[in-house]
């Protein structure tokens, strides 16, 4: 995080989202950068080096993968949805409480994926690869860029109560509808 003392601007950077994947040679990690001005994300980029895909957005200008416009999926029925999530590691806060909710949702959707890089999960929602994504205990650097990209692709990003406090409380739900 880099702040300029003259104006309310900060860069939010995650140089390696999906660190555990990288350590274990799992090819699912990214570099994530967002620009925040006056407490609002206004520009964002997520780069997946192994696929050479660059997802980006500027507030009010749409979302893109490289130079192609991306949009969230149009899946309407929850039972047809492919949902991404993150599961707290065994022994971490919230792990035991998370499992019953995960089981419930698993029985209601087409499929669940746990990929291990929140920024990529979010841009997958933006690109229509996932229909939704939820996770808790996230850091701002994990979700700042991806959240703008989802919104600019026509999706919605909130916390678990439907509010826009996800950057502060680390609880995020991204969906393919507004």
What positions do the PLM features span?
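Anionic-ligand binding patches
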Residues: 30-65
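An extended, acidic
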Residues: 71-178
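Flexible, acidic active-site loops/lids enriched in D/E/S/T/G that coordinate Mg2+ and/or position polar
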Residues: 1-38, 45
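Conserved catalytic motifs of the protein kinase core domain
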Residues: 8, 28, 40-42, 52, ...
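Conserved G/P- and acidic residue-centered "switch" motifs that form tight phosphate/ATP-binding loops
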Residues: 19, 48, 150
């Amino acid at each position: 995080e880099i702040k300029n003392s003259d104006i309310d601007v900060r860069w939010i950077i995650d140089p390696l989202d999906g660190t555990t994947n990288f350590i274990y040679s799992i090819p699912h990690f990214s570099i994530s950068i967002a620009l925040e001005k006056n407490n609002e994300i206004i520009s964002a980029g997520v780069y997946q080096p192994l696929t050479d895909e660059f997802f980006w957005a500027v507030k009010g200008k749409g979302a893109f993968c490289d130079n192609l416009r991306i949009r969230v999926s149009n899946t309407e029925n929850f039972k047809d949805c492919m949902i991404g999530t993150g599961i707290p590691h065994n022994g971490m806060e919230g792990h035991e409480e998370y499992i019953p909710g995960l089981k419930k949702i698993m029985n209601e959707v087409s499929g669940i994926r746990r990929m291990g890089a929140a920024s990529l999960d979010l841009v997958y929602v933006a690109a229509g690869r996932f229909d939704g994504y939820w996770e808790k205990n996230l850091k701002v650097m994990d979700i700042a860029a991806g959240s703008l990209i989802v919104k600019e692709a026509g999706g919605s990003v909130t916390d678990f109560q439907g509010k826009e406090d996800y950057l502060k409380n680390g609880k995020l739900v991204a969906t393919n509808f507004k």
